[in-house]
């Protein structure tokens, strides 16, 4: 499955760890074998293949000038050179990243030659994208946008398709993939017919605001008319003849709604025409004169108004022309680079190209959907838009390290603002960073991260008012304190400080982001244990430290000191608790025993990369020694795990590497060089740093080819087949690692997520290579790491503190033509030049440069240097800047034009509607706490008020305000709090000085109607102490107010304050025979101030005689039923009293079948729910949302279920409901949660026991994918519980479980008249209400009433209480009247009542009560008795009205009760019965009403639909050569074939069938296992649907034949290519063709061209008399048996068989089969009788027992055999003892006798005593005692002493066995020979001689690296072999467990 666990999933890590432990003998040495030390310093550089000019410098003649933007200059030159006019004139960045053809294909080359790799992208992924729209998958060989279109995430539909018709037929156009070309801004390719007489050049692109455009240039070699048709599943609504199609789509997880618009233009400007939900146009082409048309699909979102502008400009505006549209889009796209991206140039173009590519990755993986709400309202960096596709906190900080260098702050600021606003509330009350709730299916935790630290760095780059720093500090402080307090979170993985210290602890490797690569978790015996972690703690320290600095910048000294104290405590505990002094290393530490974790990762060094470790400490510096050794932490591959530790454990888990590893390695390298003397000590040199830059660049290029960059999620060398590369005698991952970095390098596996970002590297080019150091003040600091051999580089187009900045290194001035040396340019002016690379701090105001290192650099300050560089907090933002809006969304006013940015409503005295004050989770104070974080809100859930109110009294008294901001909570995904939406409208008032309330006048609202999250209301200033907001909720939703803010801005509003028309939207959620669900939304602007909004549904049109019946016409969302099938136009109208808005929708109405889906009224539960889902996720199956896409958290599944019970999914109602059918929608992710194989329904009977539901005739349990699986019941099932049951052990998923109850005609209402002052409990509203059904019956259905309070009854009042009725969607109502004169109301008048019943009902039940109206005018229900004569007079066979009189039982009515019964015709009935269908005879496959196939058993390009019975059979027109395309003729299952796959015909009536045949096809003349392909199945069979709903095999009367059709044999056999079978006739409604497909070493699939079915007339002949003679004889025999000779139980069962047989004998209609069956049952029953033992048999057994006892007591036999005999004696005595008190069977006595005899025969006589020889053991003991201690290690010596003691103990044991003696001697000898091996001089590196004896490599004070080779193991092996001891080599072969699929 696809749940939140990251990257790689292991089937059984415990098993892998166990194998590792065995393989190493439990050893914990760092390295298991004597691998030669390979220094990273000796690692070579990679070799890049592909283009000699990867940066396309030859195509760019722009002269570099650091004083201006090189990208701007280049862009301007591109425009001058006509870039953008067509695809032959590209912009420079597009040229650099251009991809052509369908390359690469998995073939790479290095210096050694060619090699293969897995995971190439084939140029299949579409680069062009909009801010929210893109192609998640892309099918480039089809015209249009074909694949899975994403709007922020997958929609599971193509954008649009294009078909071509010419010469009267549809044309097949094939892509010429060699002509494929794509750049970041567009994609183009060529399509043509087979004869190339017709070709189309397609150019497609997606505009910034999500308009998907395809320009098609159509050309023909001859004059002809060509008709083009385009269709989009997004937009198919529109009248024929119109020029545009529209649609409406709720995007995934209901995050927003898009309103697609679809149109197309011809070259002459005319529009395409709508026809049948598609757009079409006919082009009259002249030979070789091309015409260009343009198709556009606008994915319009209300929150992106420019999406409408961009679409309309192309539909009818100035971009209607195809060329103009294209130029606008690609030009806009490429201008973005100028506005945002820094330019980097170095001596290595291959690195420079990765810089460009990575800027593009940051852009491609950025979501900027501006969705209002709590998910993606900010521009946000996403991890893997082609993969996980979520803002994941683990990687958000990494992405900001790059995006902070974008010139606009919105990208980095947006990411940390998003993380802050979606933070999760902890049990301790803090809000900690948590993965974005927009996509809970892909990551849903709080992982290690440094968001606050990265955010603080971004602030130091871009700056802003101090309130920006304060915002960051607040969210950072919440996060750190939340993590430190996390011990009791519902998700245990979110508990990260279980021992109350200041360190992060985890038990799950995914928290690191490295999953099974994190070797520390694989320590044997530690599975599931927690450890304090260096990585998470370092990141938390960085965040705490950043929060402290941000508070300090904001002027909040108290909080700054608080957070600094927390940071200092974390630092202290890391350096004390996690520092292992014994070997000078940081290590993780196990919580349970305080032991250091033995195994390490790069993660152990995060305290270095984050700067936590103090500098100047030689011990701390020595910890970096491991980076000197490639066997520990190689430069490449840059793994997570210390490779020596991985080797010591035999490489458990996975061993991947990724940019997520390269990033911290770069950080460790740079920190080590700068701060920890790593270069000085030789651990990490500048040369190594350079190599790492090169290898990081190399990793991006597929096959090492610089034409094809692709960052995958991870890479590995698992499938790299190598020998013993390092010469250690063992072939393992160390050899693969070494091979990967040799011969120029190679990567053999690239993972499945393409063009993702997991880690970043561009920051190192700016900060480490160029040396830019972000600061708060107005100084500029440079601190570069010198790259050996690089004599020049530049970083240009930087934006820093609101200034343009360039950095240039030109050693001798020859490369760029400027000053020689190291120069800084600010604001277009030279600031200074240093003669060398050095650590420098430039003070612009003073015009000075401070040299901070010992370089003795000589610096010259520029004469015109800019002096007014701002400090970070001096940077301002205006209203036009995007960043101002972002902060407004987060509750911070940074608009520089604002008179005051102080929110006067913060911490106000706030009161809300009284009911809500009781909800401590969401109290009113949350609305003024200064937080817009999503879970801090005041909520009205549970309120039954029409409106709810908040009063805000300012804490500082009267305030002048002109700007109020409201932030509303919005529910969306499963990780948001359900049931909340922005209000339908809200009203603002202020309190005047006299205490009265007045509406705030002249309101200008943005948006006009309430929106999720941010709403701004500007108005004429008022002075007040208190404001009030009144909210009207949307139907069925509560209102959540995250924050209310009030400002005095002095800014005049733009916009209107006039009343706006109510906003109305509506759509059809679903439409079935149980009604259509209508979802409506009505919003208003709150004007007029005293007005109320009303809503009404009405029918505009429909089929003749068709009527739409609304369950509640006044509700915005309701259900409607129809009496006739057809199209209905329905209208939702909303009025505010002045203006009216409406929305019309079209519904295809299906006549009601008399049922309604009552599942939403139930509560859902399951036997087990996936542990990664919310515990109550079963509720998703009744939420009304059918989901087929891979969204686990929006569905239910039981992945991980090990309960051992049959999985079930249950619905429970408040009372019994009459169910008639059910429908289940199954869900699969195609992996861990497979498609359901079978299921059944059960209901709870009256006793609560589960019973199988009996299905109606012809019904069966189907398992169809992507549609509902419906079953109808034989009879109504009256129950309060229904469940789906799956096979035991099944892993299953379900999206929706619908249960349909008989729909009542009406439900009785309730009337109560009570005394004023009564208590609510005195109302005693009934627990059930009576529901009336069309068949005349009534049922008492459970009702749940709304809340009634004592306050409502305290004074005279009249009100209604709604009741939810189980089984009735429209519910009921109780009319309550509280009157002070109630006691005097004794006699009233019974009110007339009515009841409707359908004609021909069997009977009618009448109401038990009637309302009686009393003199005060109010009703009360009283019991009634109806007149029998009137009831009998009702003629249910005739339509008419009938009156029934009745008497109120208690005499409270002075008049007779009156009931009018309306007998009406059944609108769904028929006056004449349907005739029986004629039998289908002959070959009837064409008469099948439906064809389906088994789940997931067809190739998408070769579906079964329309193929199997289309009459297209194999003939001589089929291919004669191998491997030709027949996909349009067959049901093909290549890649999907599996045993038991089937095709199914449904006939819609009973048919009798006696033959079937099929034509199979193989696409190779001979089966070729090496090629695979389509192949004839090994076997096939026919199954039919039996009456009991099961599938049964037919009984062949002739064997099945299998005929092979192929290019060598095209139906030219005697059988004409048919495989056939004849069988005993079966009568059924459905038939299956079941296949056993061929399997081979390659991928195969079955192909079926045609499937024939032969029917015969199955009409039953008149029955002949049945012969019952045999049954009569069998009954006589049975009745003559003596019951006393058998056990009572067996006789009772036999008697039932006799009774059943007698009943058949007495049945005149019994068939011959039934008679024969009873004869057989009587015979079998008699055989099953259990005979009782006779007295003789029991006496014989007793004698045998006595004899056996004598033998047992004789003492002649072994104890073991006597023990077995005694058990047999005991068992035999037990049998006889049973006979004393009850029945003992003959079989039991016989069995006991046999067992006893067997035990006697098995007695064994005692052998002579064993002689044990101990001489050899004695000799070994004496030898060991003389051992020389100096020849042993201390550990080996202690082991020897232990073995001596153990051997002596065995020697002294007189009862010791020979085996014990031998084992003791073996163990002692092994320990004796475990001596040390003599160390040999010389290098361990293959090919290197031992000539370098320089002391620099052998310093006496050097701490040796961990993981050094331990040669003792090898020596001991030799010695032990000499001693006759064999060492068992255990080595796991093949794949070591690295899974390539995310769980």
From Swiss-Prot:
Q: Which GO terms describe its cellular component?
A: membrane
Q: Map out region (Disordered) in residue numbers.
A: 1875-1906
> Any idea where the FIVAR domain is?
1678-1716, 1746-1790, 1823-1864
Q: Where in this chain does the record put each PKD domain?
A: 1061-1157
Role description:
Beta-L-arabinobiosidase that removes L-arabinofuranose-beta-1,2-L-arabinofuranose disaccharide from various substrates such as carrot extensin and potato lectin. Also acts on L-arabinofuranose (Ara)-beta-1,2-Ara-beta-1,2-Ara-beta-Hyp (Ara(3)-Hyp) but not on Ara-beta-1,3-Ara-beta-1,2-Ara-beta-1,2-Ara-beta--Hyp (Ara(4)-Hyp) or Ara-beta-1,2-Ara-beta-Hyp (Ara(2)-Hyp), suggesting a specificity for unmodified Ara(3)-Hyp substrate. In the presence of 1-alkanols, shows transglycosylation activity, retaining the anomeric configuration of the arabinofuranose residue.
Basic and acidic residues bias: where?
Answer: 1890-1902
Q: Name it.
A: Beta-L-arabinobiosidase
Per the record, the domain of life is: Bacteria
Instruction: Answer yes or no on keyword Membrane.
Output: yes
**Membrane-spanning residues:** 1908-1928
Temperature behavior of the protein's activity? Optimum temperature is 30 degrees Celsius.
The family annotation for this protein states: Belongs to the glycosyl hydrolase 121 family.
**Entry's SUPFAM superfamilies?**
Galactose-binding domain-like, Six-hairpin glycosidases
Under Enzyme Commission nomenclature, its number is: 3.2.1.187
Check the UniProt entry and state the signal peptide residues, or none. Answer: 1-32
Which reactions are catalysed by this chain? 4-O-(beta-L-arabinofuranosyl-(1->2)-beta-L-arabinofuranosyl-(1->2)-beta-L-arabinofuranosyl)-(2S,4S)-4-hydroxyproline + H2O = 4-O-(beta-L-arabinofuranosyl)-(2S,4S)-4-hydroxyproline + beta-L-arabinofuranosyl-(1->2)-beta-L-arabinofuranose
Q: How does it sit in the membrane?
A: Single-pass type I membrane protein
What does the entry say about activity and pH? Optimum pH is 5.5-6.0.
Q: How is it modified after translation?
A: Predicted to be exported by the Tat system. The position of the signal peptide cleavage has not been experimentally proven.
């Amino acid at each position: 499955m696809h749940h939140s666990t990251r990257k790689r999933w292991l089937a059984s890590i415990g098993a892998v760890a166990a194998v590792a432990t065995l393989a190493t003998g439990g050893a914990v040495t760092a390295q298991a074998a004597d691998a030669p030390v390979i220094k990273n310093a000796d690692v070579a550089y990679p070799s890049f293949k592909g283009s000699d000019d990867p940066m396309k410098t030859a195509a760019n003649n722009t002269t570099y000038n650091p004083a201006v933007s090189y990208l701007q200059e280049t862009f301007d030159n591109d425009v001058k050179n006509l870039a953008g006019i067509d695809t032959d004139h590209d912009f420079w960045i597009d040229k650099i990243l251009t991809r052509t053809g369908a390359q690469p294909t998995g073939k790479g080359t290095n210096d050694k030659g060619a090699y293969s790799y897995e995971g190439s992208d084939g140029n299949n992924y579409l680069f062009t994208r909009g801010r929210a729209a893109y192609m998640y998958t892309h099918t480039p060989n089809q015209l249009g946008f074909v694949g899975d279109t994403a709007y922020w995430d997958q929609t599971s539909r193509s954008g649009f398709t294009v078909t071509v018709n010419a010469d009267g037929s549809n044309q097949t156009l094939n892509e010429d993939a060699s002509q494929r070309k794509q750049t970041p801004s567009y994609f183009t390719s060529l399509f043509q017919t087979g004869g190339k007489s017709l070709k189309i050049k397609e150019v497609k692109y997606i505009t910034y605001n999500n308009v998907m455009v395809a320009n098609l240039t159509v050309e023909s070699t001859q004059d002809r008319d060509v008709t083009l048709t385009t269709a989009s599943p997004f937009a198919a609504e529109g009248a024929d003849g119109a020029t545009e199609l529209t649609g409406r789509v709720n995007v995934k997880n209901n995050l927003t709604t898009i309103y697609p618009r679809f149109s197309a233009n011809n070259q002459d400007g005319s529009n395409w025409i709508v026809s049948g939900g598609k757009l079409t146009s006919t082009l009259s082409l002249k030979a070789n004169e091309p015409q260009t048309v343009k198709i556009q699909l606008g994915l319009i979102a209300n929150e992106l108004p420019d999406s409408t502008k961009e679409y309309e400009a192309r539909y009818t505006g100035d971009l209607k022309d195809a060329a103009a549209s294209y130029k606008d889009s690609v030009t806009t796209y490429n201008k973005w680079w100028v506005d945002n991206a820094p330019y980097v140039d170095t001596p290595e173009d291959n690195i420079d190209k990765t810089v460009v590519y990575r800027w593009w990755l940051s852009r491609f993986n950025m979501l900027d959907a501006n969705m209002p709400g709590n998910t993606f309202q900010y521009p946000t960096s996403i991890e893997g838009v082609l993969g996980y596709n979520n803002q994941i906190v683990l990687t958000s900080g990494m992405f900001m390290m790059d995006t902070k260098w974008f010139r606009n702050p919105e990208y980095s600021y947006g990411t940390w603002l998003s993380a802050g606003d979606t933070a999760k509330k902890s049990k301790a009350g803090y809000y900690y960073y948590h993965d974005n709730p927009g996509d809970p299916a892909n990551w849903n935790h709080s992982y290690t991260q440094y968001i606050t630290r990265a955010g603080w760095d971004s602030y130091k780059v871009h700056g802003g008012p101090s309130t920006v720093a304060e915002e960051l500090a607040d969210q950072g402080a919440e996060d750190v304190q939340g993590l430190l307090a996390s011990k009791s979170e519902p998700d245990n993985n979110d508990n990260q400080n279980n021992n109350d210290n200041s360190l992060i602890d985890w038990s799950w490797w995914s928290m690191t982001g490295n999953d099974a690569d994190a070797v520390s978790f694989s320590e044997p015996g530690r599975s599931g244990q927690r450890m304090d972690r260096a990585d998470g703690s370092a990141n938390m320290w960085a965040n705490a430290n950043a929060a402290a600095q941000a508070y300090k910048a904001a002027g909040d000294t108290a909080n700054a000191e608080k957070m600094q104290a927390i940071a200092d405590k974390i630092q202290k505990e890391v350096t004390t608790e996690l520092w292992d002094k014994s070997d000078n290393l940081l290590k993780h530490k196990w919580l349970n025993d305080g032991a250091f974790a033995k195994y390490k990762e790069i993660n152990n060094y995060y305290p270095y990369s984050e700067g936590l470790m103090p500098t100047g400490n030689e011990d701390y510096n020595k910890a970096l020694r491991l980076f000197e050794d490639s066997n520990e932490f190689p430069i490449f591959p840059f793994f997570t795990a210390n490779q020596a530790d991985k080797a010591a454990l035999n490489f458990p888990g996975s061993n991947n590497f990724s940019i997520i590893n390269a990033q911290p390695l770069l950080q460790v390298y740079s920190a080590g060089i700068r701060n920890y003397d790593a270069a000085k000590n030789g651990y990490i040199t500048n040369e190594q740093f350079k190599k790492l830059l090169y290898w990081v660049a190399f990793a991006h290029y597929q096959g090492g080819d610089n034409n094809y960059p692709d960052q995958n999620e991870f890479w590995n060398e698992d499938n790299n087949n190598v020998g013993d590369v390092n010469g250690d005698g063992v072939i393992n991952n160390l050899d693969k690692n070494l091979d990967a970095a040799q011969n120029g390098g190679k990567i053999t596996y690239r993972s499945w997520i393409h063009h993702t970002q997991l880690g970043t590297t561009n920051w190192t080019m700016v900060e480490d290579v160029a040396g830019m150091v972000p600061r708060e003040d107005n100084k500029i600091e440079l601190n570069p790491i010198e790259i050996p051999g690089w004599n020049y580089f530049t970083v240009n187009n930087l934006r820093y503190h609101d200034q343009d900045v360039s950095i240039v290194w030109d050693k001798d001035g020859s490369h760029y033509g400027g000053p020689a040396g190291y120069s800084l340019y600010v604001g277009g002016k030279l600031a200074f030049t240093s003669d060398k690379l050095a650590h420098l701090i430039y003070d612009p105001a003073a015009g000075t440069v401070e040299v901070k290192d010992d370089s003795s650099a000589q610096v010259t300050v520029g004469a015109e240097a800019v002096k007014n560089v701002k400090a970070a907090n001096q940077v301002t933002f205006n209203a036009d800047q995007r960043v101002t809006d972002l902060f407004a969304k987060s509750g911070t006013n940074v608009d520089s034009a604002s008179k005051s940015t102080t929110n006067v409503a913060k911490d106000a005295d706030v009161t809300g509607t009284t009911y809500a004050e009781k909800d401590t989770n969401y109290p009113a104070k949350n609305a003024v706490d200064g937080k817009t974080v999503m879970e801090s809100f005041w909520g009205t859930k549970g309120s039954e008020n029409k409106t709810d109110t908040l009063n805000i009294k300012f804490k500082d008294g009267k305030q002048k305000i002109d700007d109020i901001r409201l932030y509303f909570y919005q529910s969306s995904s499963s990780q948001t709090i359900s049931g909340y939406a922005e209000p339908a409208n809200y009203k603002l008032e202020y309190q005047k000085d006299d205490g009265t309330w007045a509406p705030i006048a002249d309101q200008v609202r943005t948006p006009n109607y309430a929106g999720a999250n941010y709403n701004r209301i500007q108005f004429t200033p008022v002075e007040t102490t208190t404001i009030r907001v009144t909210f009207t909720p949307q139907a069925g939703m509560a209102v959540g107010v995250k924050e209310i803010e009030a400002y005095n801005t002095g800014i005049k509003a733009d916009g209107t304050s006039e009343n706006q028309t109510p906003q109305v939207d509506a759509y059809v959620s679903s439409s079935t025979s149980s009604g259509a669900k209508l979802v409506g939304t009505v919003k208003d602007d709150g004007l007029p101030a005293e007005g109320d909004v009303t809503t009404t549904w009405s029918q505009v049109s429909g089929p003749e005689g068709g009527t739409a019946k609304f369950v509640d016409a006044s509700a915005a969302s309701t259900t409607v039923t129809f009496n006739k099938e057809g199209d209905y136009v329905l209208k939702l109208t909303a009025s505010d009293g002045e203006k009216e808005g409406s929305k019309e929708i079209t519904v295809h109405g299906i006549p009601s079948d008399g049922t309604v889906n009552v599942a939403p009224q139930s509560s859902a539960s399951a036997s087990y729910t996936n542990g990664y889902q919310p515990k109550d996720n079963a509720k998703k199956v009744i939420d009304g949302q059918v989901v087929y896409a891979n969204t686990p958290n929006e569905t239910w599944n039981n992945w991980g279920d090990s309960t051992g019970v049959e999985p079930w999914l249950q619905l429970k109602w408040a009372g019994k409901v009459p169910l008639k059918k059910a429908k289940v929608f199954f869900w699969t992710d195609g992996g861990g949660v497979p498609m359901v194989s079978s299921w059944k329904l059960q209901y709870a009977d009256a006793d609560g026991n589960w019973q199988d539901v009996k299905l109606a005739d012809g019904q069966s349990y189907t398992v169809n994918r992507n549609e509902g699986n419906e079953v109808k019941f034989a009879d109504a099932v009256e129950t309060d519980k229904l469940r789906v049951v799956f096979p035991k052990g099944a892993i299953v998923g379900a999206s929706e479980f619908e249960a349909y109850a008989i729909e009542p005609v009406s439900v009785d209402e309730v009337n109560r008249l009570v005394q004023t002052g009564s208590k609510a409990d005195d109302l005693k509203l009934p627990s059930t209400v009576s529901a009336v059904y069309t068949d005349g019956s009534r049922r008492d259905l459970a009702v749940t009433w709304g809340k009634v309070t004592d306050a409502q009854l305290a004074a005279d009042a009249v009100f209604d209480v709604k009741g939810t009725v189980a089984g009735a969607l429209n519910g009921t109502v109780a009319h309550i009247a509280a009157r002070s004169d109630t006691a005097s109301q004794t006699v009233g008048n019974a009110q007339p009542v009515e009841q409707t019943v359908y004609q021909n009902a069997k009977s009618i039940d009448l109401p038990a009560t009637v309302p009686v109206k009393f003199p005060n005018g109010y009703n009360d229900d009283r019991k009634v008795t109806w007149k029998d004569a009137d009831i009998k007079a009702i003629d249910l066979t005739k339509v008419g009205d009938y009156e029934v009189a009745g008497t109120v039982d208690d005499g409270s009515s002075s008049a007779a009760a009156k009931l009018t019964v309306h007998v009406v015709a059944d609108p769904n009935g028929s006056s004449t019965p349907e005739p029986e269908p004629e039998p289908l005879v002959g070959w009837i496959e064409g008469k099948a009403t439906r064809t389906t196939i088994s789940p997931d058993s067809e190739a998408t390009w070769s579906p079964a639909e329309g193929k199997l019975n289309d009459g297209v059979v194999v003939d001589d027109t089929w291919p004669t050569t191998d491997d030709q395309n027949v996909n349009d003729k067959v049901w093909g299952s290549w890649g999907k074939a599996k045993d038991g796959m089937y095709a199914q015909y449904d006939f819609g009536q009973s048919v009798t069938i006696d033959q079937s045949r099929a034509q199979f096809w193989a696409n190779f003349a001979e089966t070729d296992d090496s090629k695979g392909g389509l192949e004839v199945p090994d076997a096939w069979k026919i199954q039919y649907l039996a009456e009991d709903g099961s599938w049964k095999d037919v009984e062949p009367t002739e064997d099945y034949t299998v005929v092979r059709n192929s290019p060598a044999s095209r139906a030219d056999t005697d059988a004409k290519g048919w495989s056939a079978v004849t069988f005993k006739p079966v009568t059924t409604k459905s038939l299956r063709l079941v296949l056993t497909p061929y399997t081979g070493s390659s991928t195969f699939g079955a192909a079926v061209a045609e499937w024939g079915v032969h029917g015969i007339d199955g009409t039953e002949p008149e029955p002949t008399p049945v012969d019952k003679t045999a049954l009569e004889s069998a009954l006589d025999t049975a009745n003559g048996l003596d019951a006393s000779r058998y056990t009572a139980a067996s006789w009772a069962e036999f008697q039932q068989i006799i009774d059943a047989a007698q009943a058949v004998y007495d049945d005149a209609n019994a068939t011959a089969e039934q008679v024969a069956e009873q004869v057989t049952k009587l015979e079998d029953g008699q055989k099953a009788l259990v005979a009782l033992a006779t007295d003789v048999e029991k006496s014989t057994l007793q004698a045998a027992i006595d004899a056996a006892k004598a033998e047992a007591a004789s003492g002649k036999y072994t104890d073991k055999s006597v023990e077995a005999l005694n058990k047999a004696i005991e068992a035999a005595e037990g049998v006889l003892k049973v006979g004393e008190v009850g029945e003992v069977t003959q079989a039991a006595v016989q069995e006991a006798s046999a067992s006893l005899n067997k035990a006697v025969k098995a007695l064994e006589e005692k052998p002579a005593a064993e002689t044990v020889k101990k001489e050899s053991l004695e000799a070994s003991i004496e030898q060991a005692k003389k051992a020389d201690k100096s020849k042993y290690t201390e550990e080996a010596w202690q082991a020897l002493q232990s073995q001596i003691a153990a051997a002596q103990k065995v020697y002294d044991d007189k009862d010791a066995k020979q085996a014990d003696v031998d084992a003791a001697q073996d163990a002692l000898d092994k320990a004796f020979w475990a001596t040390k091996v003599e160390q040999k001089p010389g290098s361990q590196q293959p090919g290197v001689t031992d000539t370098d004896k320089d002391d620099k490599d052998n310093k006496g004070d050097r701490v040796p690296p961990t993981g050094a080779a331990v040669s003792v193991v090898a020596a001991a092996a030799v010695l032990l072999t000499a001693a006759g001891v064999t060492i068992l080599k255990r080595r796991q072969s093949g794949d070591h467990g690295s899974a390539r699929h995310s769980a």
